[in-house]
C-alpha cells in the first residue's frame, strides 16, 4: 500500500491565550491496497488477492477552545469550553480493471460496498419497484400488484451511505472550590444505517408504526399505482397491515432495505463527570500529595435520533468497516 498525503494547518491564539483556534485540512490517496477479488468456482479457489485501488480521503478538522470565565481566585469559579468539528470525504477514485463495485460486507439482503466514483460505505439493497419513465405523470411512484401490495425490485441499488456528513463535539468544564464538573455533547449529522431490529419489530407487528390512530384498519398503500392496459393507474386496493408488513419483510431475513434504512443523525449527551480535588491541607496526615475523586456517567441522554427507539451506534459488523448495519 502506498500513501500520498497533503496537509495544511493553522494555530492561532487570542486575548492572552484565552481563545484558541486550530484548523487543519488534509488529503490522502491510498493506492495499491490489498483487495480480495472473487474467482470463478471452477478455478478451485474462491478469491485472489491483488494490490489495486485508489481511495482518497479529504477533510477538515477545526478546534475552538476558550476560557469563557476565569476567576482571579484559584478557588473561584472557572468555565472552559471546547468545540471540535470534523468532516471527511472518502471517495473511491479507482478499484481494479473491470471492477466497479467492491464488497465490504454482505449481510443477507444488505450489502456495504466501495463503488468506483462514489464514497466508501455505500449501502446497497433491494427497493420498491417504481415507475421509471420520466415522461409518465406517475414517475417515481411505487408499483403494486393486483393484490394492492408493493412489488419488490430484483436488483440491488444504493439506499444510503454509512458515513456521516460531519461531526461536532462540545465540551464544557466548570470548577469551583475544588469541585469540577464537565460534560460532552456529541453531534453526528448525516449518514445512514440499516436497522434489522426495526425490521423485526415492524414485521412482527410490535412497532407503534404498525398501528394507525390506535387501530389496524385496512388501508391503501399511499403513492402507488397498478399496471393496466400498457400503462399505470392509481391504486385503490386496500390491504391489511399484516399483509403489508409481511410483504416488506419477505426480502431475506431482515426485510426490505429501502424501508428500514434510516438517517443515522443523532445528538447525545455523551458523558458527565463530577469530581472533587482535595487540597493539600486536607491531605497533611495522609500519604497522598494530591487526591481527586470523580464519578462519570456515559451515554446519559439521547437528545435527538431517527431510529425507532434504537441507538444508531449499536452496529452489527463491529469487526469490519461496515458500520451501516444495526442488529441490536
Task: Identify what each model region corresponds to.
Residues 1-116, 256, 260-328:
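Extracellular/periplasmic, surface-exposed regions of secreted and cell-surface proteins
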Residues 1-13, 20, 107-185, 232-283:
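Outer-membrane beta-barrel transmembrane strand signature
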Residues 5, 36, 46-47, 63, ...:
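Generic serine detector
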Residues 30, 56, 87, 128, ...:
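Intrinsically disordered, low-complexity sequence elements enriched in Ser/Thr/Gly/Pro
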Residues 50, 69-162, 193, 200-236, ...:
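Conserved small-residue
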Residues 190-292, 297-298, 310, 314:
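Extracytoplasmic gating/loop element in the C-terminal half of outer-membrane beta-barrel translocons
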